[in-house]
């Protein structure tokens, strides 16, 4: 009777403490199955059996047989993944900003024996451990890093929980931060900082665009000048090559004409033909001067055409300054030279008409 009264009093105290803390253990809500000798354990559950108050064994899923009176099912542990909402709590960052943060915890019981005898309420213990670990990890980071390094923060919390909860037979699979609430003033300052950062980026992008545009324009002008100079260079080279070709062609033609003329002069009466040609050109030059300009070069006797022809032939002889090839004798060459000297002396001065 005293034992029953003590157990009843303990149950009432436990229920009162549970109601005061706002949590309900899973084992208390579902109750424990009775020993009916033949038991069927559901899949993904582990029943902890005590014999005469001491741990006896863990019932596996399926058919199991127990001894009446001696054996008692003391704990029922679920081996499924358990989802626990971590209540919202306050935490202070490295730069002394107070945050309100909550999360979701995913865990699984790996050892039913440790989960039954290692801790009174494993779920509640893990929840409290997650809260303390989260406060500790947030104290190592500044406010900006809390938002940037959210994944690494979750991983650090999981590692810390697994190290502490190993003796409880529980493994934390993952932890996710749900919401992070900052004070209104801090939120306003963060918004201003974001706007300033955006304006800064816009200004930088605009300046970079202007810079690239100026570079492109300068590069275009440079390329245009280079292409223009190369085109001018090519044009000058082509023009010079054309002029050189023309000069060479004229020189070749003139040389060929001189060779032909020299060959003609060596023939019979070639000197006489050359003298006649020079005389004709001499007379033609005087006629052109009279047509093109008011300046006229008058011979000593303009009415005597014969004297003009003689003067022209004298000029021809002076230019040759040598006996004409094919002449009959040297006396004729001397006579031509004398005639040239006389003709040169008879040339008149330039007079204005």
UniProtKB/Swiss-Prot annotation:
Main localization is membrane
| Residue numbers carrying N6-acetyllysine | 145, 233
The residue stretches assigned to a coiled coil in this entry are 215-252
Q: Which residues carry this modification: Phosphoserine?
A: 17, 330
Listed SMART domains = PHB
The answer on whether this UniProt entry bears the keyword Hydrolase reads: no
Name the chain's protein: Stomatin-like protein 2, mitochondrial
Taxonomic source organism? Rattus norvegicus (Rat)
